[in-house]
Structures are given as structure tokens and as C-alpha cells.
Amino acid sequence: MIFYESNFTQYLDSINRINIHKKNTELYQLFRNKPYHIIIHGPSGIGKYTQSLKFISMFSNSHLKYQKKFTITNDKSKYIFKLSDVHIEIDFLTLGCNSKNIWNEVFSNILNITHSNQYSLFFIICKNFQFIHNELHESFYSYMQTFMVNHVKFYFVINTNNISGININIRNASYILSLSKPPESIIKKISSQTPF
């Protein structure tokens, strides 16, 4: 698997070639009928982001081939977010200490995008959730409770290295999926098949 793929389909191609978390495929099929908030946790580099894309890809009409960048600029910084036909990605590592204001602006724009494009379902992938600022963390559950706005159902896919610091309300509202490091034999097999 290439470490930093440049688009969604490259991640999906890599997981279709070598999927070290095959047990999740059946679980994702169950979610197809009834999507739910999900927390995917495990050590860095284990494939949380790739598993997130695999999960939401079955809801995408374009199979995540549609990719755009969405930019928010404030007086200090410029923030770039990836957007597909079914999701947006927010990296909490890049939001910093002004994250609550940025989040409110992003969420407002998400509502506009989904309403204008008449989506019925939309996912928000929250990368590096372990870096969420305390002020935003305290109010984050209220966003998760907003399951439906303007006839659009919103679901959060949270990627984090650990769940111990996540608010109990967020954990209770989500399915928790734990990813573990594969055996050494599988890592060697993957290494031998991966072009560098």
C-alpha cells in the first residue's frame, strides 16, 4: 500500500488489493442498510482512514471518483478540506486552538452544500480526532445529535488513535471499531507486494 495516496480511488484500490482488516467488510454491509456513527480507532498507520473510505464508498454513486477541495479562509489561515459526493474530511490536527469557530463555519458550509445538491445522506470523516480542542469537544455531541437537517442525514466517521479521551456521549452514540496491528507474517507479505 502506498503511504500517501493522492486521491480516494487510490486508497480504495490499495484496500482491494490487500485488505488486512477483511472482517470489517461484513460489518460495512450491515451498515449499508442502516448507517450509523462510527469510531475507528487503532495505532497510527493501521488503516483507519482507508477503512473509513471503504465504509463510505458503498454510499457513493461515483465510487468516490468525484473529488473536490473546499477552502475556508479566515484572518489568520487558510483551511483546505477534501470533499466527495458523499463526504467531507476534517483533520482536527490542522484546526488548532480556534477550532470551534472554524468548525462552525465548516458545518454551516456543509449544510449549504448538502442542501443545494439535494443530498439525502452525508458523512463527515473526522481525522486525528485525538487532537480535538477541548472547547469543541464539549459541544461536539450536539452536532452528532443533528441526524437530519433539511432532509439530509448526517453521520460521523471518527478516526482516532485512542478512545479513552472521547466524551462518553459521543462513544455511546457510535459503533466502536477497533483496528489492531496485523501479525508480522502479513506485514512482510504486504511489504513484499508494495511498490516503493
Language-model segments: what does each one mean?
Residues 1-129, 138-139, 149-158, 168-170:
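P-loop/Walker A NTP-binding region and its immediately flanking N-terminal helices
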Residues 28-32, 187-194:
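Alpha-helix C-terminal capping segments
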Residues 96-98, 184-187:
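A short acidic, often aromatic-flanked loop/helix-cap motif at beta-alpha or helix-coil junctions
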Residues 128-132, 163:
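Conserved Walker B
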Residues 154, 167-185:
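A short helix-turn-beta junction within AAA+ P-loop NTPase domains corresponding to the substrate/partner-engaging
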Residues 173, 177, 189-196:
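Conserved AAA+ ATPase "sensor/coupling" helix adjacent to the nucleotide-binding pocket
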